[in-house]
């Protein structure tokens, strides 16, 4: 069985502020290590549960955060930026039995984490699809479903886990922390890794019968930007329209068209 892990940093245990997520700062290194160790815990658990192949994609920033030496020997790591359409890298296809997300965070404008954001924190204020607030979990879970692959697991802040469970009923989750203003109440990294690894056998078992959620027949997307000039510029995307000084709308029936829109306007 084959599994694909998307790994981000803002949802890992103990990360609290933006400085810890940015590689230019001294406080980043421990968080990058924790990102790698949580991904490693998921991979170990998957292999122990019967997985034959595990691919981990480094999703944070430039995609060069995870120290490959910290991963299980038989895991594979996708590093860097492929410049594929969002959620449709050439590496990920319908041959996978399940997608898992580690270290994910709440959506832009949501309170689950002081570092809540959607893709680009300095640019995107809020993103909705068919009236529902979407973050990165929702974007990628639907991208997996578009490929016919179920999303089995997510770890990250409590807000993200709750939203993810509403998006994918039956989803396995490990909450790492809860947001409180510009602070977090966090589990210890050791406990989070134990919980992630311990849940992977259940994820492997679930993959044998799991089916991806049905995609909507139509997608109405609204992206609200921090700056009005970004909205104006992105409104020139074919099929997009400016519906307020800071909000661009886009409609499509095919989720692949939505992902292409995201690639060029986020």
Predicted regions and their residues:
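Short beta-strand segments
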Residues: 6-7, 57-58, 99-104, 154-155, ...
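Flexible, glycine/proline-enriched loop segments at strand-loop-helix junctions
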Residues: 29-30, 123-134, 147-151, 183-190
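Glycine-rich nucleotide/cofactor/substrate-binding loop typically near the N-terminus or early
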Residues: 39-93
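Active-site rim beta-loop-alpha module in soluble metabolic enzymes
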Residues: 143-151, 155-204
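C-terminal accessory domains and tails appended to enzymatic cores
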Residues: 179, 192, 197-266
């Amino acid at each position: 069985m084959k599994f694909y892990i998307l790994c981000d940093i803002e949802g890992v245990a103990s990360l609290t502020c933006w400085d810890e997520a940015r590689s230019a700062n001294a406080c980043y290194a421990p968080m990058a290590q924790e990102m790698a160790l949580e991904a490693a815990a998921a991979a170990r658990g998957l292999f122990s549960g019967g997985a034959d192949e595990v691919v981990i994609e480094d999703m944070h920033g430039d995609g060069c955060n995870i120290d490959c030496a910290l991963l299980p020997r038989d895991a594979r790591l996708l590093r860097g930026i492929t410049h594929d359409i969002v959620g449709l890298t050439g590496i990920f296809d319908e041959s996978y039995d399940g997608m898992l997300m580690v270290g994910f965070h709440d959506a832009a404008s949501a309170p689950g984490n002081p570092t809540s954001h959607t893709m680009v924190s300095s640019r995107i204020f809020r993103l909705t699809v068919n009236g529902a607030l979407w973050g990165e979990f929702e974007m990628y879970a639907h991208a997996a479903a578009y490929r016919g692959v179920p999303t089995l697991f997510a770890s990250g802040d409590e807000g993200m886990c709750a939203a993810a469970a509403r998006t994918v009923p039956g989803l396995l989750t490990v909450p790492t922390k809860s947001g409180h203003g510009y602070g977090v109440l966090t589990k210890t990294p050791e406990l989070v890794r134990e919980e992630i690894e311990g849940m992977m056998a259940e994820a492997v078992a679930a993959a044998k019968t799991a089916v991806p959620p049905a995609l909507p027949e139509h997608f109405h997307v609204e992206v609200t930007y921090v700056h009005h000039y970004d909205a104006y510029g992105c409104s020139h995307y074919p099929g997009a329209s400016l519906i307020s000084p800071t909000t661009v709308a886009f409609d499509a029936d095919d989720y692949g068209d939505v992902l292409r829109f995201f690639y060029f306007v986020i």
